[in-house]
Amino acid sequence: MAAAKIKKGDTVLVVRGKEKGKQGKVLKVYERVKRRDKQGNPVYVRHFVIVEGVRLIKKHVKPIEGVREGGIIETEGPIDISNVMLICPNCNKPTRVGFRIVEEGNVRRKYRYCKKCNENIDLVSEKVIKGG
């Protein structure tokens, strides 16, 4: 699986839709397979995020004895990942995310970086290069 440009715990800005302009922390990132080929391999996959306090939906839930009361609860709904932008922790602006590979000695590190301020956001992966 490819590295994610938006991860759990990131602060994002909603850039499209009814909730446009709202900010929040990413609670969950997941994907849904929309279509599969004849062998059962995913062909069309959509990525979604759940953002804290954004796209609140009402759910009608039945009571479960000893666990919860029944009634109407409010919870966050999914937003397509293309409708949110990461807010850079360094410059505090909404930005696109890129990946940068840095080789230091025999270690190869992959970073996410802000395309506005060109600063590293966080380390994605680290590999030790054999021989060479």
Swiss-Prot record:
Keywords assigned by UniProt, alphabetized: Ribonucleoprotein, Ribosomal protein, RNA-binding, rRNA-binding
Mention any Pfam family matching this sequence: ribosomal_L24
| GO CC terms, sorted | cytosolic large ribosomal subunit
**UniProt superkingdom:** Bacteria
Name the PROSITE patterns for this protein: RIBOSOMAL_L24 (PS01108)
Q: Which GO terms describe its biological process?
A: translation
Stored SUPFAM superfamilies: Translation proteins SH3-like domain
- Main role? One of two assembly initiator proteins, it binds directly to the 5'-end of the 23S rRNA, where it nucleates assembly of the 50S subunit. One of the proteins that surrounds the polypeptide exit tunnel on the outside of the subunit.
The entry's family comment says: Belongs to the universal ribosomal protein uL24 family.
Q: How does it assemble?
A: Part of the 50S ribosomal subunit.
NCBIfam families of this UniProt entry?
Answer: rplX_bact (TIGR01079)
This chain belongs to the protein called Large ribosomal subunit protein uL24
In which organism is this protein found? Aquifex aeolicus (strain VF5)
Q: What is the lineage of its organism?
A: Bacteria, Pseudomonadati, Aquificota, Aquificia, Aquificales
